[in-house]
Amino acid sequence: AASAASGMAGSMPAASEVEEVSSEVRVLPGEEGVVMPIDQGSLEEMKTGSYKFAANISSVDTKKRQMTLTVYGYDAYRAEDVDALDVGSVFSTHLDGAVEAQNVTVEKIEKNEENGTVSINGGIEEGGVDLWRSGDIYRTVTYDDYPVYYMMGELVLPVDDSVTLSDSSADVDAVPVETSGTIEVGKAVSEDKDNWTPYNTTVFTKDGAVSNILRIWVP
């Protein structure tokens, strides 16, 4: 999986995982013997909690002070769980970004400790899975170092009055354009309506309300 693995030692894309802002790592419940991903929280929990997640923003209703968006997650695993994988092991993953997770049996596995990558069943080039280590977790990785995103579902969330947007999507060297307030942020979203995607957009929430949006340049 050279094309997926090359350049992985670089920095992680800023559009990032769904994660509770102050949480300890816990894995999802699953069948006995199946390695499960880290629990990223449910859509229900996101309505009241403090999270950051990759998102596709559809619209901002400035009168109602609400944002409609689709939340995207990706699979990440505890390092010790991935380190223990071997031929015959079974793990749960959203293969190719499928909405439903499925159990995959490891038929072949290559571990590269130098660059922190693990290629399972030939990696993404052969319909398998590539993982990349970052700290104490491994996450799925596809071309251009992105995670393999899968859709978690749509949410309509309140927008904090003091919401901020930091937008450096214009080009690779763009200085971030800072915008604040529901009306101004809503205007910025509607002026570039189809270009808020999980690959460039990270949404931060506080107690269930959108507090900050980060959009980066992507090639």
Segments predicted by a language model, with ranges:
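Gram-positive cell-envelope targeting signals
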Residues: 1-23
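Solvent-exposed hydroxyl-ligand-binding patches built from regularly spaced Ser/Thr
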Residues: 18-219
